[in-house]
């Protein structure tokens, strides 16, 4: 009995060893088959790629008919390669499947026979899983090879069907895509270089214009002095109880200052026209020797007429200086009035001439119409001469008058756009705006404190003149007094007091000023008749 048991155990051990040897051989065969399959797949893919490259190069060099034949041959070879690979992979998969089944059956049998072999069975399962992974990997590689073959086939077909022009277009497109970034970078660098060049040229242009124009400028004053032959003349100018000096101040709106300064009378006022009329009147009175209210009225009226002639002469001289020919007489008179207008202390007529010259210089540098540029620059601020008489800004008024007197459209647009109210429609309009900024912004050209003082006095007079029945109004004593002359037929004696209170209220409401402002309303009634 013991012998039988021993023989049975020996038989089991021998059987187990035999099975182990067979399993080991089976594993080696499986690994060998897998390695061979992988190598064959790599070789086949390399051979297919090599043949495809060779066929493509050959197809490119030969004629169209030869390319078609080579493509057919390539297709046939690729098909055969694919069939051979599929057949080999199919056979190998079948063998692996059969081997896997046999190993599974044997492992199951051993598991039923001996529980001690469980650990080895687990190891075998792991190897089986590894084989499955490898099989999956082979399948994926097979799919990749098939995809590569399809892509190569499609590429060969596309290349074979291309003409020379199409092939050139493909190459150019690919090259353009590759160079897009480089092109964009170069364009950006070129734009920066152009901007830098334009800035330099603009600065050079302005520098040349400023160097070629050397103009004198003296800040406008708000006082005028009149020299007397002797100090005795001061008493005659004042008159009995001050009636002469009061008449002169009332008619001209200018402060006549007589102090201890020997042989000098000072005329103070922010309006240059009034101040000049007062100067002309006073000099005529001194020369004539007859100084009384009636003579003062007569000479003031005469001085106003002479002032109109002088204004026209100023306009003609400025137009001749700038070369603005065939100007309408009314425009000449308007420009002459600018001789007695200031902007931040800068004489507006001299500013207009300067802008015209600067615009002409810049136009010549840029190849534009020099005469038209000078004319536009000269007329750009003419609205300032009449902005107190017509509603609107000086730009709107100047544009309207330029159209009224049939000025060139370029001139009209330059006037309308020099402060940016409308878009410039020509290079000359831009030149005029630049020349205006250059003339007014240079150091010393303008004095803001003087302009603020003059503006305050003008606002004071405008408030007084806004009431119905007011004939004229004059700001005196540096704005510390406002003297209003009313129409005697519109304002009665009782209404004079009421009007003064209304004007005072408007001044307090709309103006900021230091100290007090004296409001004087004068109603003068005259009856004139002639004896025959």
Swiss-Prot record:
InterPro entries xref list: HD/PDEase_dom, HD_domain, HDIG_dom, KH_dom, KH_dom_type_1, KH_dom_type_1_sf, Ribonuclease_Y, RNase_Y_N
Membrane topology: Single-pass membrane protein
Domain of life: Bacteria
Chain segments annotated as coiled-coil in the UniProt record: none
EC number: 3.1.-.-
Keywords from the UniProt entry: Cell membrane, Endonuclease, Hydrolase, Membrane, Nuclease, RNA-binding, Transmembrane, Transmembrane helix
Domain KH residues, every copy: 222-282
Region (Disordered): 101-139
Residue ranges of every copy of the HD domain listed in the record: 348-441
GO cellular component: plasma membrane
GO molecular function, one term: RNA endonuclease activity
GO BP annotations, alphabetical order: mRNA catabolic process
Biological role stated in the UniProt entry: Endoribonuclease that initiates mRNA decay.
Entry protein name: Ribonuclease Y
Species of the source: Streptococcus thermophilus (strain ATCC BAA-491 / LMD-9)
